[in-house]
């Protein structure tokens, strides 16, 4: 009978809902929820353990303690259900109602709700327009507030102290009304006429001009309107009735020994009830005012502590001095309701164990210990045992399994067949951290994992553990097989490259197998095919590396899609011919006819996937692994101490370097160089020496001399084990070999600065004590950093997921013509990322034309696959416009065309794909990887020698962009402008190289000249920045007063003296406002003007600048007037990288940002004030000019009379993304953030597709600020969801009304997450109290659009397989249909129950 009831209950559908609204609860509403008033603070009777009547656990109010049984025991059993016992007043029903029935407490005096009082900005304060301090004084009974002034001179809401109140009473009697406590505030709130107030405020807003006042008024108007629209009443922010949480949510558990463990809430409620009852009694007794007042204050404090302990004053502590956990603490933070229970749940049917290698497994398999499988698949086994009639009841089946009878194992095999399990390794940083496999039963207790999936899991076998989960329902198994099977996850969603790539042993084996060797055994044989090659090798007639000729048959498809065979005799080696046997049909032989390193193998698998598709690739990957393992074992490659060959040149190189260092030291002592310069130069010398040693060592290791068949000596690539491991990419790198056999080099201190004495020894020679100490210095920092950065990186991922969680592909094409221009990323002489890699998998936004013609190469809306990219390269297309997520026009989502290819699948993305989460994981996952990988080079400083010249790599035409230059006395060009770019253009007009040329460089070639490859075109001193004059004349010192702004440094040895400008911090008071400068005058002492402007030539000198000229000396243009020493850089490491990425995504303004031109026009300088210059830009069309004050110490890039465009850099510095957005637009800011983030990851060799970063940028740009509201109901200056503005404007344009104008805003990811439309999502992220308070006051509706909200309310997410369900609901809602609820009769129910039982609890009978 009980089962039948449960079954009936399961048949009733849960109610469907479309949105969740949060609002203030009115006292009547609280009473309507309640099942009775809690009058006593007692909980349960400690002798009988029965709840006390009218107490906090009262059974009459909250429901029975035992199922279907009243408290006194008069009614028991199901037949009485719904009866209310006349003796104890308890309803006979299930005990789980104690989780949902609420009670209430009638408060004897109103109390303010602390959230609306103290959560900043205080809602009560904003509404009443009173300072929080005053409201608190009223609430806590320190002063009176005037409620009605009547005919007196007292203002409404005026605060009166006790004395003032008494005086007023004497003067006016009862003409006026003033109260204290929450009653007073309640009265004030009740008397407010919201609509009237709104009107007056709007009028005020139109009249006022002051910015601060406007801000305050808009805030108040918004709050008032929220109250009007939501139907909340302001006086509901003051509680008169307090709801009581259901008792099962604040349990009281008896421990042994007569003590109780209780939830803190019970204590807090007890305090409230006690104080409330005492207050009631005092009021009945008409006690003196002062006593009542004190009791009311205490009640207010008790209610505050219950709602949010510690928000005001000291937190109330329990018996053990620990603050009590209040209602607010229950929901916020990592341990709160949201993050602990709603977003993270525990999973049953799971197990965990250590993992070991399963080298014989297929890619879709994993080894599952029998013990574990038996436990996990128990329900299925029970079902099968009953179905087969081997056990009559579940109990019998249970016994059989416990005895582990032989039949049980057979049934386990059946149950497990084709039933995938999920394997997960923590931390799950991206979706590949959980994959599905088919279990293979094994002996032992460790889970076996396929080696190729280790890269995706970031797993190794040094004791890692993994968890196993069993998908129970048919749908879950289907999803696991179709979407999560390891064979379906060959490509990484972050960059679209294979992630199932052999590494380590396999790579070494394949590399060893495909190497060739001069004069090996069997060289010159001619073989009939791979089979014979294998026979010859097995018979010992030929070596694996012998160069032979083999007949090879290749296949390729013709136009009719049929395989065509092509046979030829190819020069190759035995090993490569053997490897060819496992290469799938359709790949060219050239793919294996080379020494295969890790990159080549990856490329081979990628090619295989693109040409042949999924299945052959999976089989091929497995085969490469088996072969690789086999031949790695055959090779017997191992590391011996003699494999580390130390180059002979090492001693000589080190001696030379030491001599150079001694020379610099000498110069330093003679005063020719400063301490900073000396340090930098020493570091450079050692860095260069280290490079030379490394080069010599690698030459030594990488080649060996052998005698070929003709008896002649020949050099070939060496078979040294260490070299082979590094060369193949199996393990180790040149940097590590350098430490083993070269020299360890420079090390970093914990603060990142480089220690100038390098470690000249290597690990083979061994380190002495000092060297060892220096080593540990940096290595420790590496480990400490790792721990910190893992946490940081995890937090970054969490913020990214939170900001992007609701972004899903919702339609096929939004039809926009917008997009972003893509060009190759060029840094220095290298194309860091060619165009094809940037546009692959994107959709063209405009027709792509053949360069120089009007012929269409590719039409608009073409998805660029590999073939199309080849076409672009053929026609040498240099830039093209592609669709981008940032410019997608879809409201609430993104369209498939703007996103392009699904990187993990290789076709255009499907609707319902959760691209936001994928993007967040793709960016966050390497963050952790990188942070974990800092210490691998043992803190060895990897700082390259400072650049001091530009040497071009390709021949072509030199092009200088924004360059100004002068010719110096030697006839060379000297650059005098700041952001100069130098580009090399090839004959097709494509940019091949691009360099930044620093200020003060000497150019060997000018703009437009032809340059040969390898030519040096520019030189500069990397350690100092010169100040260069553009005019000739005589020097005149201004404001250079000894001891105030400058100091003379005379060299003891050389007697040369130079002037050093003091930093403003080092100057005396008199020197603070002086501005040391060098002025250039002509022979008569008149100012010389800068050419092309009417500004006198004078050069302001920054602090620390060194001048080696005297007053009045003659100089000519292009000469150096002064040198500013550059600070030495620390080491480049992702440490700088991770905070940098976080700063970019948080859109933080840099400390001293670049100053950009606000409008286009001509520059001039206005009147100067103390410490600032006035920059004036006058537009050419003569409209209003723009002024800005710039601190004098800022170096300006512009001169008087120069023309600038809006958004040009006026003064150097890191650019602020907000300025870029404001002045250059959305695309510029997207490009900036994308490039800067990619820069950090590229340094670490991590590839991430640009799309992911653009997705995050789109989410950062989702708000806009209204400039003028037009006919919309937005307020000027209000921040609104961008899509809402777009929708509103579309409606207005359709009706021919005035639309709103707006400016896009860039929000940092934390801000953007908190500003989302969904309050549930925001509350579960951070600042829960604030978010909920705001939402409740505004009466917000959550439409449950994102993923997070849906997870929290416990239904399918609107993405992936849940997308269809939500689309269906939307359709039904639009059609106005009622949700279909199947009506079930009792007969049908019992029939289907019987059917269920016969089928063995839903076991599958097809096996």
From Swiss-Prot:
GO terms for molecular function: DNA binding; DNA-directed RNA polymerase activity; magnesium ion binding; zinc ion binding. Disulfide bonds: none annotated. Keywords: DNA-directed RNA polymerase, Magnesium, Metal-binding, Nucleotidyltransferase, Transcription, Transferase, Zinc. Mg(2+) binds at residues 460, 462, 464. SMART domains: RPOLA_N (SM00663). One of its GO terms (biological process) is DNA-templated transcription. It catalyses: RNA(n) + a ribonucleoside 5'-triphosphate = RNA(n+1) + diphosphate. Its cofactor is Mg(2+); Zn(2+). Zn(2+) 1 binds at residues 70, 72, 85, 88. Transmembrane segments: none annotated. Binds 1 Mg(2+) ion per subunit. Zn(2+) 2 binds at residues 814, 888, 895, 898. Its EC number is 2.7.7.6. One of its GO terms (cellular component) is DNA-directed RNA polymerase complex. DNA-dependent RNA polymerase catalyzes the transcription of DNA into RNA using the four ribonucleoside triphosphates as substrates. The RNAP catalytic core consists of 2 alpha, 1 beta, 1 beta' and 1 omega subunit. When a sigma factor is associated with the core the holoenzyme is formed, which can initiate transcription. Belongs to the RNA polymerase beta' chain family. This is DNA-directed RNA polymerase subunit beta'. The lineage of its organism: Bacteria, Pseudomonadati, Pseudomonadota, Gammaproteobacteria, Enterobacterales.
């Amino acid at each position: 009978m009980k089962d039948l009831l449960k079954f009936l209950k399961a048949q009733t559908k849960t109610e469907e809902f479309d949105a969740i609204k949060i609002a203030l609860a009115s006292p009547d509403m609280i009473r309507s929820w309640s099942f009775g008033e809690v009058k006593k603070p007692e909980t349960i009777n400690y002798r009988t353990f029965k709840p006390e009547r009218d107490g906090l656990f009262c059974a009459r109010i909250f429901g029975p303690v035992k199922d279907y049984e009243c408290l006194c025991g008069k009614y028991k059993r199901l037949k009485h259900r719904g009866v209310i016992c006349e003796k104890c007043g308890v309803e006979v029903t299930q005990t789980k109602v104690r989780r949902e029935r609420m009670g209430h407490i009638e408060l004897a005096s109103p109390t303010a709700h602390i959230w609306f009082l103290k959560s900043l900005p205080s809602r009560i304060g904003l509404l009443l327009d009173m300072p929080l301090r005053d409201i608190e004084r009223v609430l806590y009974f320190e002063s009176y507030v005037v409620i009605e002034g009547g005919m007196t001179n007292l203002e409404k809401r005026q605060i009166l102290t006790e004395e003032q109140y008494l005086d007023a009473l004497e003067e006016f009697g009862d003409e006026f009304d003033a109260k204290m406590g929450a009653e007073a505030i309640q009265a004030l709130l009740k008397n407010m006429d919201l609509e009237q107030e709104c009107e007056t405020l709007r009028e005020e807003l139109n009249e006022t001009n002051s910015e601060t006042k406007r801000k305050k008024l808009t805030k108040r108007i918004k709050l008032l309107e929220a109250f009007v629209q939501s139907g909340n009443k302001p006086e509901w922010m003051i509680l008169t009735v307090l709801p009581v949480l259901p008792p099962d949510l604040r349990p009281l558990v008896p421990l042994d020994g007569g003590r109780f463990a209780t939830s803190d809430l019970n204590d807090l409620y007890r305090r409230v009830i006690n104080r409330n009852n005492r207050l009631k009694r005092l009021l009945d007794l008409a006690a003196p005012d002062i006593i009542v007042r004190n009791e009311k204050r205490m009640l207010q404090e008790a209610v505050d502590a219950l709602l949010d302990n510690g928000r005001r004053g000291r937190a109330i502590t329990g018996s053990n001095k620990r603050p009590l956990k209040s209602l607010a603490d229950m929901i916020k933070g990592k341990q709160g309701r949201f993050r602990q229970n709603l977003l993270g749940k525990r999973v049953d049917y799971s197990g965990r164990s250590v993992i070991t290698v399963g080298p014989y497994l297929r890619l879709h398999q994993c080894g599952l210990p029998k013990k574990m499988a038996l436990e996990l698949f128990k329900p299925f086994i029970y079902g099968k045992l009953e179905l087969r009639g081997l056990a009559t009841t579940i109990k019998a089946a249970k016994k059989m399994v416990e005895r582990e009878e032989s039949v049980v194992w057979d049934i386990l095999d059946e149950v497990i067949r084709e039933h995938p399990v999920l394997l997960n390794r923590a931390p799950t940083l991206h979706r590949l951290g959980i994959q599905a496999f088919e279990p293979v039963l094994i002996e032992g207790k460790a889970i076996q994992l396929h080696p190729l999936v280790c890269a995706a899991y970031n797993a190794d076998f040094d004791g890692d553990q993994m968890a196993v989960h069993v998908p129970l329902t048919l749908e879950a198994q289907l999803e696991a097989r179709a979407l999560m099977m390891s064979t379906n996850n060959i490509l990484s969603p972050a960059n679209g490259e294979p992630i199932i790539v052999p590494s380590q042993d396999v790579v070494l084996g394949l590399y060893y197998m495909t190497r060739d060797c001069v004069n090996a055994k069997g060289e010159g044989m001619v073989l009939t095919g791979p089979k014979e090659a294998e026979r010859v090798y097995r018979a010992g007639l030929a070596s694996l590396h012998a160069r032979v000729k083999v007949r090879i048959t290749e296949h390729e498809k013709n136009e009719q899609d049929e395989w065509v065979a092509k046979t030829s005799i190819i020069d190759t080696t035995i090993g490569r011919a053997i490897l060819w046997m496992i290469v799938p049909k359709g790949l060219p032989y050239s793919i294996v006819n080379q020494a295969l390193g890790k990159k080549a193998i990856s490329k081979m698998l990628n090619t295989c996937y693109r040409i042949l598709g999924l299945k052959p690739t999976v089989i091929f990957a497995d085969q490469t692994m088996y072969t690789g393992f086999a031949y790695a074992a055959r090779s017997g490659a191992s590391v011996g101490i003699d494999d580390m060959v130390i180059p002979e040149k090492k001693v000589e190189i080190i001696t030379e370097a030491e001599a150079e260092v001694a020379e610099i030291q000498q110069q330093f002592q003679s005063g020719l160089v400063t301490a900073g310069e000396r340090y930098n130069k020493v570091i450079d010398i050692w860095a260069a020496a280290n490079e030379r040693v490394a080069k010599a060592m690698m030459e030594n290791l990488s080649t060996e001399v052998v005698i070929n068949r003709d008896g002649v000596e020949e050099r070939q690539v060496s078979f040294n084990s260490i070299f082979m491991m590094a060369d193949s990419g199996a393990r180790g790198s040149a940097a590590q070999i350098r430490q083993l056999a070269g020299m360890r080099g420079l090390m970093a201190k914990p603060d990142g600065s480089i220690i100038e004495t390098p470690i000249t020894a290597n690990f083979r020679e061994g380190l002495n004590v000092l060297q060892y100490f220096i080593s540990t210095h940096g290595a420790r920092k590496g480990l400490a950093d790792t721990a910190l950065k893992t946490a940081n990186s995890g937090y970054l991922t969490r913020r990214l997921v939170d900001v992007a969680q609701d972004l899903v592909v919702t339609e096929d094409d939004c039809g926009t013509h917008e997009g972003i221009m893509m060009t190759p990323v060029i840094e220095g002489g290298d194309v860091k990322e060619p165009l094809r890699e940037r546009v692959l998998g994107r959709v063209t936004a405009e027709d792509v034309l053949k360069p120089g013609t009007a012929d269409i190469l590719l039409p608009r809306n073409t998805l660029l696959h590999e073939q199309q990219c080849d076409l672009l390269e053929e026609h040498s297309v240099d830039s093209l416009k592609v669709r981008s997520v940032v410019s997608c026009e879809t409201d609430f989502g993104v369209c498939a065309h703007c996103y392009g290819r699904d990187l993990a699948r290789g076709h255009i993305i499907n609707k319902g794909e959760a691209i936001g989460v994928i993007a967040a994981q793709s960016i966050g996952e390497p963050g952790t990887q990188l942070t974990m990988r800092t210490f691998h080079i043992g803190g060895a400083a990897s700082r390259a020698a400072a650049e001091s010249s530009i040497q071009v790599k390709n021949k072509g035409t030199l092009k200088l962009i924004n360059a100004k230059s002068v010719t110096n006395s030697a006839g060379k060009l000297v650059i005098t402008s700041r952001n100069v770019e130098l580009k090399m253009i090839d004959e097709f007009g494509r940019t091949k190289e691009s360099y930044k040329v620093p200020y003060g460089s000497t150019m060997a070639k000018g703009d437009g000249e032809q340059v040969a490859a390898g030519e040096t075109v520019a030189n500069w001193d990397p350690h100092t920045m010169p100040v260069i004059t553009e005019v000739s004349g005589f020097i005149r010192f201004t404001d250079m007063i000894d001891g105030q702004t400058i100091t003379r440094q005379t060299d003891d040895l050389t007697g040369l003296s130079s002037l050093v400008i003091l930093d403003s911090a080092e100057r005396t008071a008199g020197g603070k406002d002086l501005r040391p400068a060098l002025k250039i005058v002509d022979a008569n002492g008149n100012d010389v003007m800068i050419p092309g402007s009417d500004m006198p030539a004078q050069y302001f000198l920054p602090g620390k600048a060194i001048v080696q000229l005297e007053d009045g000396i003659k100089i000519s243009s292009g000469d150096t007037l002064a040198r500013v020493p550059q600070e030495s850089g620390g080491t480049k490491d992702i440490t700088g990288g991770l905070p940098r990425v976080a700063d970019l995504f948080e859109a933080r303004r840099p400390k001293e940002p670049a100053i950009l031109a606000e409008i286009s026009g001509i520059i001039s300088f206005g009147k100067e004030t103390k410490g600032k210059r006035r920059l004036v830009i006058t537009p050419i069309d003569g409209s209003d000019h723009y002024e800005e004050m710039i601190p004098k110490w800022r170096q300006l890039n512009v001169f008087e009379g120069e023309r600038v465009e809006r958004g040009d850099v006026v003064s150097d510095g890191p650019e602020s993304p907000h300025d870029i957005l404001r002045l250059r637009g959305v695309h510029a800011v997207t490009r900036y953030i994308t490039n800067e983030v990619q820069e950090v990851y590229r340094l670490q060799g991590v590839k991430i597709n640009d799309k992911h970063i653009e997705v995050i940028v789109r989410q950062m740009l989702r708000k806009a600020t209204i400039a003028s509201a037009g006919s919309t109901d937005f307020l000027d200056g209000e921040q609104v969801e961008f899509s809402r503005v777009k929708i509103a404007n579309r409606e207005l344009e359709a009706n021919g009304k005035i639309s709103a104008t707006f400016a896009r805003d860039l929000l940092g990811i934390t801000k953007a997450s908190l500003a989302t439309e969904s309050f549930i999502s925001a509350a579960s992220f951070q600042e829960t109290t604030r978010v909920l308070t705001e939402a409740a006051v505004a009466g917000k509706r959550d439409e449950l659009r994102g993923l997070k909200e849906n997870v929290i309310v416990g239904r399918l997410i609107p993405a992936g397989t849940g997308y269809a369900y939500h689309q269906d609901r939307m359709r039904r809602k639009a059609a106005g249909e009622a949700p279909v609820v199947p009506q079930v009769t009792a007969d049908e129910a019992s029939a289907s129950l019987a059917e269920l039982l016969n089928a063995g609890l839903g076991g599958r009978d097809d096996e």
